[in-house]
């Protein structure tokens, strides 16, 4: 009908490949951002939860440490 250039679908093929490459790029960026979010959450939990709980556990451990009895109390 009104065909100006016989390109045998090269333009359509190129446009489809650009869409595929754009989609792969978006998926890759999303994956990198997800990994970055995981590292950020881990850092936040490390500073907010893990370190204070570790310090409280250290205080609890030192509080619960029992001194051994002296030898004059124990009669063997």
UniProtKB/Swiss-Prot annotation:
Family the entry assigns: Belongs to the alphacoronaviruses E protein family.
Name the record gives this protein: Envelope small membrane protein
Role played: Plays a central role in virus morphogenesis and assembly. Acts as a viroporin and self-assembles in host membranes forming pentameric protein-lipid pores that allow ion transport. Also plays a role in the induction of apoptosis.
Other facts noted in the record for this chain: Bat coronavirus 512/2005 is highly similar to porcine epidemic diarrhea virus (PEDV).
Transmembrane segments: 15-35
Bilayer topology: Single-pass type III membrane protein
PROSITE patterns on file: COV_E
Subunit structure: Homopentamer. Interacts with membrane protein M in the budding compartment of the host cell, which is located between endoplasmic reticulum and the Golgi complex. Interacts with Nucleoprotein.
Ranges in the topological domain labelled Intravirion: 36-76
Locations listed in the record: Host Golgi apparatus membrane
GO-annotated biological processes: disruption of cellular anatomical structure in another organism; viral budding from Golgi membrane
The organism of origin for this protein: Bat coronavirus 512/2005 (BtCoV)
Residue intervals annotated with topology Virion surface: 1-14
UniProt keyword Membrane present: yes
Gene coding for it: E
Keywords: Apoptosis, Host Golgi apparatus, Host membrane, Membrane, Transmembrane, Transmembrane helix
A Gene Ontology term for the protein's cellular component: host cell Golgi membrane
């Amino acid at each position: 009908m009104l065909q100006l250039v016989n390109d045998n679908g090269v333009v359509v093929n190129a446009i489809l490949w650009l869409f595929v490459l754009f989609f792969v790029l978006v998926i890759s960026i999303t994956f990198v951002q997800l990994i970055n979010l995981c590292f950020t959450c881990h850092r936040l939990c490390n500073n907010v939860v893990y370190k204070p709980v570790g310090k409280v556990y250290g205080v609890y451990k030192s509080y619960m440490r029992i001194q051994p009895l002296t030898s004059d109390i124990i009669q063997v």
